[in-house]
Amino acid sequence: MKNNAQLLMPREKMLKFGISALTDVELLALFLRTGTRGKDVLTLAKEMLENFGSLYGLLTSEYEQFSGVHGIGVAKFAQLKGIAELARRYYNVRMREESPLLSPEMTREFLQSQLTGEEREIFMVIFLDSQHRVITHSRLFSGTLNHVEVHPREIIREAIKINASALILAHNHPSGCAEPSKADKLITERIIKSCQFMDLRVLDHIVIGRGEYVSFAERGWI
């Protein structure tokens, strides 16, 4: 009964002020629904976030880490992973259906949803038309933990095939640090030069890390 009474607080707050008014602890408590013996759901949610550092840390955790939380089993782990996957697919659909790009923030959120948590470097390209509306996006290259081989010709071939006029490049750093390497800068320059011959514009190259990002355009490098 105590857990149910505690849960009414986030629910009532959500109904009155909207879901965005909930704190991370309250949002997680709403999902968990019940606590464990001797621990109400809000306390459990607070401890989980403290253990994992943030919602990001929680949603990207592995089962070995998650199973150490007393009273929380594989079912809740599967549900949390399902939430993360739902978010990724939501941004995937939103990117296709809400063209043109609504804002740099939406682009970044989409890329974070697609690349966060990947164990290998993935190089993605968002293809845009002359009005900067999204045509499609594609994971063109996949590499290792700290390297991905990128071929500008493949990018250009795909752009020509779908009649794209502009590109947004993106890749992830599984290490968590989003700061671009020298190799990242060099391949970006190569892609830009190759695209110029085909009258293709590279609007940005965004590097996704663990809870952080770097935009070449924001840095003034493009």
UniProtKB/Swiss-Prot annotation:
The MPN domain extends over 100-222
Question: What PROSITE patterns is this protein classified in?
Answer: MPN (PS50249), UPF0758 (PS01302)
User: From what superkingdom does this record's organism come?
Assistant: Bacteria
Positions contributing to Zn(2+) binding: H171, H173, D184
Q: Kindly give the InterPro entries that the UniProt entry links to this protein.
A: MPN, RadC_JAB, RuvA_2-like, UPF0758, UPF0758_CS, UPF0758_N, UPF0758_YicR
**Motif JAMM motif, which positions?**
171-184
Entry-linked Pfam families:
RadC, UPF0758_N
Q: List keywords of the entry alphabetically.
A: Hydrolase, Metal-binding, Metalloprotease, Protease, Zinc
GO biological processes: proteolysis
The record's family statement is: Belongs to the UPF0758 family. YicR subfamily.
Q: What is this protein called?
A: UPF0758 protein YicR
Organism expressing this protein natively: Escherichia coli O1:K1 / APEC
Question: Upper lineage ranks?
Answer: Bacteria, Pseudomonadati, Pseudomonadota, Gammaproteobacteria, Enterobacterales
